[in-house]
UniProtKB/Swiss-Prot annotation:
This is ATP synthase subunit delta. HAMAP family: ATP_synth_delta_bact (MF_01416). One of its GO terms (molecular function) is proton-transporting ATP synthase activity, rotational mechanism. PROSITE patterns: ATPASE_DELTA (PS00389).
């Protein structure tokens, strides 16, 4: 299974690199990155869309039609529309989320930005995101971009990852620690 995951990462990296270089050559990095962020949000919000791109049962042509129609309707840049068509035609739609992530990471590295992956029990408000961004900018000394997601299993609190550092202040982790401490006493 790990070799499959490594393959997905390799595919995602190669496609993201090609997209990045094309967007850079055409001076469209900002528009392409904005479109990819929009696509990421769509994927995060729509289970149906995630199933369409991940399903091996749905044919290449149907995936291509779905992705290009979505890109057209969303008003994505020509580079993104063509890219999604090629990805679907090559039957690599399953790797689109990884491609988006790899592209955005490459762009952030070029701009000297760091991405903080924040998983919280509930969706963060704009004020919370702003406060976290300010605190993380100060703590890291870099410009921090927040990639927020929700995992209700955390029960409360959040997990923040910046590079190789992680701070877990989730309620589920605190309860697990308490449970372990109580077992040690008894």
């Amino acid at each position: 299974m790990s070799s499959h995951k490594a393959g997905v990462t390799g595919v995602a990296e190669r496609y993201a690199t090609a997209l990045y270089e094309l967007a850079e050559d055409r001076g469209a990095l900002d528009q392409v990155s904005a479109d990819l962020r929009s696509l990421k949000a769509m994927l995060d919000e729509s289970g149906d869309l995630r199933r369409v791109i991940a399903s091996p049962v749905i044919g290449r042509d149907d995936q291509r039609k779905a992705l290009t129609a979505l890109a057209e309707k969303a008003g994505f840049h020509e580079i993104v529309r063509n890219f999604l068509g090629v990805v679907a035609a090559k039957h690599r739609s399953f790797a689109v989320p990884g491609m988006i992530g790899a592209f955005l990471e490459r762009l952030a590295a070029r701009r000297g930005e760091v991405t903080a992956r924040i998983v919280s029990a509930t969706a963060l408000t704009s004020a919370q995101k702003s406060a976290l961004t300010t605190a993380l900018n100060k703590a890291t000394g870099n410009t921090v971009t927040i990639d927020a997601s929700v995992d209700p299993a955390l029960l409360g609190g959040m997990v923040v990852r910046v590079g190789s550092r992680m701070v877990d202040s989730s309620l589920s982790t605190k309860l697990k620690r308490l449970q372990l401490a109580m077992k040690g006493v008894g």
